[in-house]
């Protein structure tokens, strides 16, 4: 209730004292009137006898009621107090474990393992039996309705946002593929030149503090910049053919090192179920099989940590980078259909779907181009035109945080989930899955599941954006992070207080 609504409330009027109703026994009393002398003495005696008996009965009833009330009142006070005390004690007991972070028993410093399952849409964990993921959920902390990715909901922008706490416009990886208008160079997922990768990722933050970090295939981790030189045996160059089991076992092997040599921050990356999602969409049995496979890898990690006696000492944070939605040929928008209003040559287009990115020649007027495209889309003459909306990048919804970078093209189109933009019609037919759409779509949400001494058991927290994870990890490790777009106080809301 707001303060205004409180101030508008008026006190209830003081109730007027009501007249006492006549006692029911009073009707038995003779009126003291002159007519009463007409009553015979025998009648009076009889009446007095009845009156006397009634008074005795009434008195007895009143006394019984008084004793009963007193008994109930005085006996209920201790019981209530006892119940309250018991409840308080019980509440304290049930939450005492989670009032502060649990002490380490074997490790001498906090450790975080950040696990990414690419394309793990929120809800996949319910598709099949996932005993190991469920174990983390039941004994840890989960984003109740999933983790919100940053826009665009693509692999490289989101993985780098997770480890820098920055939106893509600020960490520089604005898409999986794009052109830098200043240098004319093209970024691909194999680009390791540090000039692309802005911000300070967690592995760099950790090494800045003289601590050790290890990375296994996390996007950006192969880039040598700052204090991070991708050290041999602690930084694996991407090779998609490496079995998942080998990846897990490598991470586990670090716990065989002396305590002071164990990396305090480790990453682990799996391509599934994104790999299957693109081929068959989110609802195919192949997704169920892939999710079961990821659960098996989580089980391998858990059991390996248990065998080394460190499972309860390690903080495991399991995330995805984005969700997935089904796409089919009937959900297509063709740029060539806009020719009546404006021709958009393919040379202008840096990305078609699921984010339309157009960089027209420098001597053109982006505002005029947007106006003509919008006119065509709204005309009703362009198939599925109503499912595409184009913006000057500075006019995009502020919540997307997708304008403050020269790398972002001047014109950006937002596409309805499940739809795709192509240059021209073709006979090619395909149905599968995609992501990259507006992060407001629930289908783009992924998972956040955390287990370890820093996290409460069985706790659900509201959904949040993945830029908050950077500060969460630095708080667990008790190190100072670099400036970022996360909320400084967020870690306090999701972590248990330290001792």
Label for each model-derived stretch:
Residues 30, 76-83, 91-142:
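Active-site-proximal N-terminal segment of extracellular/periplasmic enzymes that hydrolyze or transfer
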Residues 114, 132, 293-335:
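Metal-dependent active-site segment of extracytoplasmic phospho-/sulfohydrolases and closely related
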